[in-house]
Regions:
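Short, surface-exposed basic-aromatic patches at helix termini and helix-loop junctions that form
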Residues: 90-99
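Short, conserved catalytic/metal-binding motifs centered on acidic residues
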Residues: 1-6, 40, 75-85, 100, ...
């Protein structure tokens, strides 16, 4: 599941100002897409007003689409980025017995969980240079603790450093950070899942 913002020119229906990273200040539509990733098959696209980019606006359409089909035609797993890992989304999936996997935003509480587990020695290989740990986490706004998978990958290359332009607010390149030999630097990704 994903959302794409489409800037608009002219006077199309539902063309409103909203989150529009490519053309700030332009009216837009948002395309909420549901697709089968493994075979790149789009199963549904909902076109909504440009100020309806959040996943909460797409959820009624998703549930309606699923419930309009026999259970054997349902997807086997819901997967989405950080905007989809909300309490409402997870509760609705759990209510229907539909497994999910969502990436979490690295909020202060998610970062605290990473800090707690950082020094453990039982990280297991997850492929492509990533290592992972299972944990339980209950974030503010969640009704209960849920399983999270914390993934980390060692950074070996120099990193680009960015700043924010004070005039435009845009991200600007400000140089490269060289990594010291003998020190480990990691990037992290945290997933919430109902899978066992």
């Amino acid at each position: 599941m994903d959302a794409t913002v489409k800037p608009l020119y002219g006077h199309q229906q539902e063309a409103v100002l909203g989150y529009n990273p490519g053309k700030p200040g332009r009216p837009s539509h948002v395309y909420h897409c549901y697709f089968v990733a493994a075979i790149r098959l789009v199963i549904e696209v909902e076109v909504q007003a440009g100020n309806r980019t959040a996943s909460q606006y797409a959820q009624p359409g998703l549930w309606s689409w699923l419930e309009g089909r026999p259970r054997e035609q349902w997807l086997h797993l819901l997967r989405g980025d950080i905007s989809w890992g909300t309490e409402r989304m997870m509760q609705e999936a759990e209510k229907r017995g539909l497994p999910y996997l969502f990436k979490l935003k690295k909020t202060a509480n998610v970062n605290r969980q990473i800090e707690k587990l950082w020094g453990r020695q039982d990280w297991v290989s997850a492929g492509a240079g990533w290592h992972g740990l299972n944990s339980k986490l209950q974030l503010t706004g969640w009704s209960r603790a849920r399983r999270v998978v914390i993934l980390r990958r060692r950074i070996r290359e120099p990193l680009a450093v960015s700043d924010q332009d004070t005039n435009t607010g845009q991200q600007v390149f400000s140089g490269m950070a060289e990594l010291k030999h003998g020190r480990d630097f990691y990037e992290y990704s945290v997933l919430v899942t109902s899978l066992g």
